[in-house]
Regions:
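Extended hydrophobic leader/signal-anchor segments used for secretion and membrane insertion
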Residues: 1-129
Length: 129
């Protein structure tokens, strides 16, 4: 496979898109005004930064960190087979699973992989566990 073929295959497989960061809930990893590249992975892992649909507001998407997967413990609770826990890195400015509870796999929309704008913040978004 040529480089162009490999690049095209990768592009089509992961369906990249972009997202604008609007609030401070993911600071310092992501800041208001950042533009990031997002992909649709086959697998999500705790530590990934994800675009998630708010469970109580259909169509409203947020950027959060995936902190626990099905079967993992959050405090006294063990997450069910289709329950994922998301939180903002800057807890005091975040509305997340601590307020609305776990989200489903269907509500996980994409994985944030890199910031491309502004140029001074360009770089990979690293999963943190």
């Amino acid at each position: 496979m040529t480089f162009v073929g490999a690049a095209l295959w990768s592009f089509l497989r992961y369906r990249p898109s972009r997202v604008a960061v609007r609030g401070p809930s993911m600071a310092p990893a992501l800041l208001p005004g950042d533009w990031a590249l997002i992909v649709s992975p086959r697998v999500y892992r705790p530590g990934d930064v994800v675009v998630v649909e708010h469970p109580g507001r259909p169509g409203y998407e947020m950027v959060k960190r995936l902190t626990a997967a099905p079967g993992e413990r959050i405090g006294e609770r063990v997450l069910g087979s289709d329950e994922w826990w998301v939180q903002g890195d800057f807890a005091h400015a975040s509305t997340d699973s601590r307020q609305f509870g776990p989200v489903t796999r269907e509500e996980l929309k994409a994985k944030v992989v890199l910031v491309y704008w502004p140029a001074s913040r360009r770089g990979r978004v690293t999963p943190i566990r």
